Amino acid sequence: MRTIFANFALLLLLSAGCKKGTEKIRLNVPETDPNAPAATWREHWFEHVQVVKNVAYTKEVALYYDDDMPRDITWPLRKAEEIWKYTKVAYAPFKGTDKRLYVVLHYGKYGGGHPYTYFDDGHDNRTGIDIGSNNSWRDSSNWNLDVLTHEIGHIVEGGFKGVKESPAFLIWGDSKWMEIYNYDVYKKLGWDKEAERVMKDMETASDNFPRPGTRWFKDWFYPIYSQYGETAVLNSFFTLLAEHFPTKAHAYGLEYTRRMNMGEFIHFWSGAAKHDLAELATTAFGPNDRNGAAWGPQLVKAKTDFPNIKY
């Protein structure tokens, strides 16, 4: 998968069930609604070449389907709106002029998904997600819901706070931040069964970076989340990045100038938690980064380079 700030390979393997929406989908009638989004949108990115149709919209979300998507599948509008509204408050500010989330869904093509933001000329400076699946979209839980949420989380990572890019992407990869983001969204929206499903799946989940057997959710993100403020600590990490990590001017705001190293990552998360997380990092990750370099000296230097990160 590709995005405005990295190549994403969706790694979501979650499962359960949920009721389907039954409301009648509202057609886009732009001639009678001056605030309606465009009735069609011609894709011109990667291998995407479809003319997708706006099948429904609200103030918060514009939903586009390709010609193979059944029009009676309506839950994505409802779920995306709830997630997007929550996310814009929880991780504020979102500085895009157009506050709508543009959700493009495909059936039978373009497996997986990618996000895009208003920083991206290649997606006409809209903010949204584009997802394809070879399986039915009728289930409003499991992979269908998780990938929708996952891609919105990448917008937080690479396009909130008025800054483009994701300094931590090479450290946590595609899905590690998404796991705690998805869990938080489900919990805070009162989707208890979905949150429980994520928690259950994360009990046995592990990765091979920065070392084999690393349990990102269980040993790193969830301890931070549960002990140091839940949503507030997640948001604080991105706020501190926007305030202190190097940026340069961009046509639509600012852009981070580089990725961060593991020592900086631990330093900024410690600042977000207002607690020294070096011991937790050693337990979760071991003493080295994913390239085999000791992160201890990196952390020492990070404290010198970013002295205003306090904990």
Predicted regions and their residues:
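Positively charged n-region of N-terminal signal peptides that target proteins for export
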Residues: 1-6
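C-terminal motif of bacterial Sec signal peptides marking the signal peptidase cleavage site
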Residues: 15-17
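Bacterial signal peptide processing site
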Residues: 19-21
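Zn2+-dependent metallopeptidase catalytic core
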Residues: 29-122, 145
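Second-shell loop/turn segments in exported
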Residues: 63-76, 133-143, 163-169, 206-210, ...
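Zinc-dependent metallopeptidase catalytic helix centered on the HExxH motif
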Residues: 122-200
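Short helix/loop segments within enzyme catalytic domains
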Residues: 184-208, 212, 225-243
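Beta/coil-rich, acidic/histidine-enriched accessory regions frequently appended to metallopeptidases
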Residues: 252-311
